[in-house]
Curated annotation (Swiss-Prot):
Record domain tr-type G: where: 8-282
Keywords, sorted A to Z: Cytoplasm, Elongation factor, GTP-binding, Nucleotide-binding, Protein biosynthesis
Gene Ontology MF, one: translation elongation factor activity
Example of a GO biological process term: ribosome disassembly
Known role: Catalyzes the GTP-dependent ribosomal translocation step during translation elongation. During this step, the ribosome changes from the pre-translocational (PRE) to the post-translocational (POST) state as the newly formed A-site-bound peptidyl-tRNA and P-site-bound deacylated tRNA move to the P and E sites, respectively. Catalyzes the coordinated movement of the two tRNA molecules, the mRNA and conformational changes in the ribosome.
Annotated compartments: Cytoplasm
Gene3D superfamilies assigned: 3.30.230.10, 3.30.70.240, Elongation Factor G (Translational Gtpase), domain 3 (3.30.70.870), P-loop containing nucleotide triphosphate hydrolases (3.40.50.300), Translation factors (2.40.30.10)
Membrane spanning stretches: none
Positions with a binding annotation for GTP: 17-24, 81-85, 135-138
Source species, domain of life: Bacteria
Gene designation per UniProt: fusA
Family: Belongs to the TRAFAC class translation factor GTPase superfamily. Classic translation factor GTPase family. EF-G/EF-2 subfamily.
One Gene Ontology cellular component: cytoplasm
Protein name: Elongation factor G
């Protein structure tokens, strides 16, 4: 089958926002207008098409990023709906990794909110062009120009309106197009009947002022337009649109649109803007990767003629077809039934069926082309972030960074029958979600799960119950502490045992130094002259890695330490891998005496919004929880406080805030960094852990 839409006519976009900005409703409307749905599902009725997991429909939030294909103005638009809740950051990250452009949805009453900042920062890291849709213009307190100002103040974004609203709240009835300088008036509830009229007289001055600002802002990004603008020449609508497109694709400019997805206003114009201003796969730089055979950097331009290269960005378990692997094709063509090489794992995989997804229904296709997003059935070894390529043209594409989990829970099956099922369920859930870890405590035999937040683990335990029919008891959430060294030291590990026959002998000198935050453990072999034979070096590293899994102070994993093996000795007969492993772990214990070991705790960036009169309470809450205030701003009658607070102090805070503010306060928190715990707290943690043992 030939290609249905050319690469120029393909758009891969994500819809990203703060929780509750109306993102899923916006996606619903896109699917409605592009002819994919016959009846609109409302999120607050629990009937949304994209939110297809049972829990999402109950909670009214989007958890998994379903990928959907739609058509608009003879273009194919692949849409990835991303969650707005901070506990699901990895979902946002992995969808950003495979997108070409994004629509950032704002709530017009609140403007830029905490999670908007997080996803905006991630999109900037990945260099994703964006347009902004100020949604909920029908809501009480909606303020379009305030929303635009928050883009400047909180994100330092070069964002400018290309539309203005006509009316707001209940009176929101149309949109002014600042490029055509026309008004689009809505005459029915479904938003399908639109009258294009001249701009109403009372809005004309404002429209001319913002048109002028728009032209100037776009001209600043383009030398030719700047010359025309300065010489007072007329810039045509076509030139203005071309200038906006170029600057948006170069991530120098962000067009801002307005509307109300719930009231069916502004969504079609936003779809037009997706086509007009967001890039096709041809507009973005060719993807780079490493050839695993030569270690040389290679590129794969978006073209069907190039060898096949794709990135797996999501694994899902589907009740009907089993394991689904969502992937983005960067170059080449793939037929169902063919073989590909997973270059990340060095494994050959057979592509069973290829499906194009529409929320939770699917269409089987024979061929997938460059620039497309699809799901494959039948891949056994592929996980999130793996590269799939032509067997004759290997390349490893840049993977997806996975943040470390910050919270853990103990889970135990309720019955023997649940025990076996729980193992399988947890393994499948961990395959789908790289930020979800499952470990067994060797000493107690307990299963410990860890993730990005309480909601994250709640949802996973819930899925275990619903999808895998496993009943489990869940312990109270615990903080994932880490340990590290704060000073450099040298230490000897010496192990010798003689018990008749062959003995054991291992002797090492290791220099330990603190490593940069986030660098993890690094091992360096600096042995000269074979004082420790080469075959025992891996055993020394392994001994350190295994010992560091249970740190020296309270048994938490050790991070950010460099170890340099620089001296030692061996015995011709008695030395063995085991002896050197034990010697390395003894060196680590010895180093702990002088390397200033410290316990680290996750610090959360907490954003608390409260009525003015509760500001004093909130400041007290932050101080009492060992937090430090980072900034404050007023918004209407509310105060927004940003603070860094240890996760350990935030359990149960929702209840405290609710009673202090009579239910009017809200807060969001997102993991920010690890930090040393104060000495007094460290002693408590050590005492508690020793007591438990």
């Amino acid at each position: 089958m030939a290609r249905e839409f050319s690469l120029e006519k393909t758009r891969n976009i994500g819809i990203m926002a703060h929780v509750d900005a109306g993102k899923t409703t916006t996606t619903e409307r896109i699917l409605y207008y592009t002819g994919k749905i016959h009846k609109i599902g409302e999120t607050h009725e629990g009937a949304s098409q994209m939110d297809w997991m049972e829990q999402e429909q109950e909670r009214g939030i989007t958890i998994t990023s379903a990928a959907t294909t739609a058509q608009w103005n003879n273009h194919r638009v692949n849409i990835i709906d991303t969650p707005g809740h901070v506990d699901f950051t990895i979902e946002v990250q992995r969808s950003l990794r495979v997108l070409d452009g994004a629509v950032t949805v704002l709530d017009s009453q609140s403007g830029v909110e905490p999670q908007t900042e997080t996803v905006w920062r991630q999109a900037t890291e990945y260099g994703v062009p964006r347009i902004v849709f100020a949604n909920k213009m029908d809501k009480i307190g909606a303020d379009f120009l305030y929303s635009v100002s928050t883009l400047h103040d909180r994100l330092q974004a070069n964002a400018h309106p290309i539309q203005l609203p006509i009316g707001s709240e209940d009176d929101f009835r149309g949109i002014i197009d600042l490029i055509k300088m026309k008004a689009e008036i809505y005459t029915n509830d479904l938003g399908t009947d639109i009258l294009e009229e001249d701009i109403p007289a009372e809005y004309l001055d404002q429209a001319q002022e913002y048109r002028e600002k728009l032209v100037e802002a776009v001209a600043e990004t383009d030398e030719e337009l700047m010359m025309k603008y300065l010489e007072g020449e007329e810039i045509t609508n076509e030139e203005l649109k071309a200038g906006i497109r170029k600057a948006t694709i170069n991530v120098e400019f962000f067009p801002v649109l307005c509307g109300s997805a719930f009231k069916n206003k502004g969504v079609q114009l936003m779809l037009d803007a997706v086509i007009d201003y967001l890039p096709s796969p041809l507009d973005i730089p060719a993807i780079k990767g490493i050839n695993p055979d030569t270690d040389a950097e290679e590129t794969r331009p978006a073209s069907d003629e190039e060898p096949f290269a794709a990135l797996a960005f999501k694994i899902m378990t589907d009740p009907f077809v089993g394991r689904l692997t969502f992937f983005r094709v960067y170059s080449g063509v793939l037929q169902s039934g063919s073989y590909v090489l997973n270059t990340s794992k060095g494994k050959r995989e057979r592509i069973g069926r290829i499906l194009q997804m529409h929320a939770n229904s699917r269409q089987e296709i024979e061929t997938v082309y460059s620039g497309d997003i699809a799901a494959a059935v039948g891949l056994k070894d592929t996980t999130t972030g793996d590269s799939l390529t032509d067997e004759k043209a290997k390349i490893i594409l840049e993977s997806i960074n996975v943040p470390e989990p910050v919270i853990q829970l103990m889970v135990e099956p309720k019955s023997k029958a649940d025990q076996d099922k729980m193992g399988i369920a947890l393994q499948k859930l961990a395959e789908e979600d790289p930020t979800f870890r499952v470990e067994t405590n060797v000493e107690t035999g307990e299963t410990v799960i860890s993730g990005m937040g309480e909601l994250h683990l709640d949802v996973l335990v819930d899925r275990m119950r619903r999808e895998f029919k496993v009943e489990a008891n869940v312990g109270a959430p615990q903080v994932s502490y880490r340990e590290t060294f704060r000073a450099s030291t040298q230490a000897r590990g010496f192990f010798k045992r003689q018990s008749g026959g062959k003995g054991q002998f291992g002797d090492v000198w290791i220099e330990f130094t603190p490593n940069e935050e986030g660098k993890g453990f690094e091992f360096e072999n600096a042995i000269v002259g074979g004082v420790v034979p080469r075959e025992f070096i891996p055993a020394v590293e392994k001994g350190l890695v295994e010992s560091m899994a249970n740190g020296v102070l309270a048994g938490y994993p050790m991070v950010d330490v460099k170890a340099k093996l620089y001296d030692g000795s061996y015995h011709d007969v008695d030395s063995s891998e085991t002896a050197f492993k034990i010697a390395a772990s003894l060196a680590l214990k010895e180093a702990a005496k002088s390397a200033q070991p410290a316990i680290l705790e996750p610090m959360m960036l907490v954003t608390i919004t409260v009525p003015e009169e509760n500001l004093g309470d909130v400041m007290g809450h932050v101080t009492a929880r060992r937090g430090r205030v980072d900034g404050m701003e007023a918004h209407g009658n509310s105060q927004i406080v940003r603070a860094y607070v240890p996760l350990a102090e935030m359990f149960g805070y929702a209840t405290v805030l609710r009673s202090a503010s009579q239910g009017r306060g809200t807060f969001m928190m997102v993991f920010d960094h690890y930090e040393d715990v104060p000495k007094s707290v460290q002693e408590e943690i050590i005492k508690k852990n020793k007591g438990e043992d």
